[in-house]
């Protein structure tokens, strides 16, 4: 029978089920060990690849695959999870899909894209780098992609690019 093998070569005794991590085809006398990155419960005729988002963490096809954690992903049949690289994040919280690139004005963290804080900007449009502080006399909103000079009639009175420019009270 499929998933069983005649391991004692005696047609008078019943075939034995193949153990977890192995398989057999109809009429087999031995069970075949599953490849790394796959698993098989007892008595199957095939090994199943760990699905995308799960891994063969212990390289043992007799144990079930386990899910990758937050901010990680893996393709089918993998033996390790991949952490989202800089500039990307696990935006859909699905370890079966690759991490997505963060947009300009933000930077990547493994689980989410974080907008640049007030007074900073993503100067090179590369979400893998940190946000850069604006200079005195300029400001940037949260998630800024550039610093803006204070408009005519306004000044950076507190010299803090994280606060809006103030109107000129001295006129």
Language-model-detected regions and their locations in the chain:
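Disulfide-rich, cysteine-dense extracellular ectodomains and adjacent flexible linkers of secreted
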Residues: 1-171
